[in-house]
């Protein structure tokens, strides 16, 4: 895509501080960087743990970090896709939409549906969302909350 400014993925470009929580309990911190690759054809996400003394031991033991993802945009239907991989050897293909208000990621897989619904706030410098799982795609259970805060605009 020659005009990156028209691509919704442009909203993610930069560095973000991440915090994960589950049932009100702090799990851990990470840092994610979203960058254009292949002359603006795709966005790559690289996320790494940020070690801290308050990381939940269970989270640290099963952390997906580092995470790598490639995001792309279908300009004919206005939808995006994410190819995801992590340190646990997990590989997923997610469908995705990114609007001015929300970032939604989902995967329909028999017995293990997943979705993330995040909303933009603070002039799009914060994304507050939740990962959920479902066995049947109907009844959803919270997995963990995830907040992205733009780090490259912090003062």
Where in the sequence are the language-model features?
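Hydrophobic small-molecule pocket/channel-lining residues, especially in calycin-type beta-barrels
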Residues: 1-155
């Amino acid at each position: 895509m020659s005009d990156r400014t028209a691509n919704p993925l442009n909203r993610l470009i930069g560095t973000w501080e991440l915090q994960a929580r589950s049932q009100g309990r702090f799990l851990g911190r990470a840092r994610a960087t979203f960058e254009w690759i292949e002359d603006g054809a795709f966005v790559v996400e690289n996320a790494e743990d940020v070690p801290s003394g308050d990381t939940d031991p269970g989270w640290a033991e099963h952390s997906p970090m580092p995470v790598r993802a490639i995001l792309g945009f279908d300009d004919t239907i206005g939808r995006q896709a994410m190819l995801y991989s992590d340190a646990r050897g997990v590989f997923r293909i997610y469908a995705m939409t990114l609007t001015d208000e929300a970032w939604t990621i989902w995967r329909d897989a028999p017995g293990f549906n997943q979705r993330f619904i995040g909303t933009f706030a603070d002039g799009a410098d914060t994304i507050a969302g939740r990962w959920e799982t479902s066995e049947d795609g109907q009844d959803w259970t919270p997995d963990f909350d995830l907040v992205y805060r733009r780090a490259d605009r912090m003062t």
